[in-house]
Amino acid sequence: MIEFIPLEYYTKFYYFIVLFVVFITFINSKVAFLQDRNNLKNLSLVGFLLLFFILIYMGLRPVSGKYFGDTSTYSFIFNDYKTDNIQSRDNVEYSFRFLLQICSKIMGVNAFFFVCAILYVMPLYYASKKIFNQYWFLAFIMLVTSMSFWSYGTNGIRNGLATSFFIYGLTKSTLRTQLIWFVIAFGFHKSVTLPILGFLLTLKFNTPRGFLIFWFSCIPFSLLIGSSFQNLISGVFEDDRLNSYFYNTTQLSEFSKIGFRWDFLAYSATGVFAGWYFIVKRKFEDKFYTKIYSIYVFANACWILVIKSAFSNRFAYLSWFMLGLIIVYPFLKQQFFKNQYAVLGTILGAYFTFTFILEVIIGYR
């Protein structure tokens, strides 16, 4: 466990390290050619160093509820399994329950969180490697610089595990294998039902135009009757955790504000615009990209319907975890700009700057 860094600076230290890596990548994009073999080797080396740092730094963090949210809650649940206390066993989904059962028998709580970090980060690495081959680092860094990445590796751990397995499942070549991984993802957190539903819809309706119309329609709908929609959803599901996301206002200083989050909407719109620009404006034809873009737009539109809820960021995460892929994918698959690597470097810099300002400088939660 890493104890030499004060807890109050632990998360900020992570962002400063990532800032340094982003800065190096930004400079590299201005002075080097992406296709150069030596440059690709250097980028891969930086990527592996970043991967190693994240695994160690996230996985060996101290157990603290004050600074890492639900980390302390999961430590209590783990200790219940360790001591055969059955009180917590019916409160977690089957994949996470299986993980707890195995880990509690052979390791301590700190090692358990390290395993969680591996299961959270490595699927993103493997997915980046599978989709982008030698350019994997640029996709990976877009994923780990997302505004929600650190939070869902240290706070909403089950959500993070579920979405990482979902992304990994998307890379599989057969529908059967994809669905198997989606079932595993669902077993970590039921909220991943939303992107899974989006995936199933794309099997029949993989046309971005329809999803875009739905996305834009949800904005005025949410402004006018969003609260009524929240009441309807909470009544249908009758889930205490879901209802607390809608109505709990006792911990707003630690989470998000209530009200229509125009800042979150603007952040989400970057992905909506990116996909529209490449698919519609630049006529980029790629079935996989069209699919993940449609899933993103669908999940984000559903979040807009409940954007006024107390924990709006947790619903937004069900689309935000794909945002980095939506932005970077076309850049690594087809030539669109004269100095495309330099353009991508600028976008990466702007993308992480937004995250850095919100998380480190002002703190959006």
Give residue ranges: language-model regions.
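Transmembrane-helix signature of polytopic, membrane-embedded enzymes
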Residues: 128-145
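Alpha-helical transmembrane segments and terminal signal-anchor/GPI-anchor hydrophobic tails
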Residues: 67-76, 97, 198-314, 359-365
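Membrane-interface transmembrane helices that cradle and orient dolichyl/undecaprenyl
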Residues: 160, 166-177
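Membrane-interface alpha helices of multi-pass inner-membrane proteins
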Residues: 177-201, 304
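Loop-to-helix entry region of an early transmembrane alpha helix in multi-pass inner-membrane enzymes
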Residues: 94, 106-120
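Short hydrophobic/aromatic helix or loop-helix immediately within or flanking a transmembrane segment
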Residues: 70-107
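Transmembrane-helix motifs of polytopic, lipid-linked glycan transferases
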Residues: 115-131
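Multi-pass, polyprenyl lipid-linked donor-dependent membrane glycosyltransferases
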Residues: 140-141, 151-166
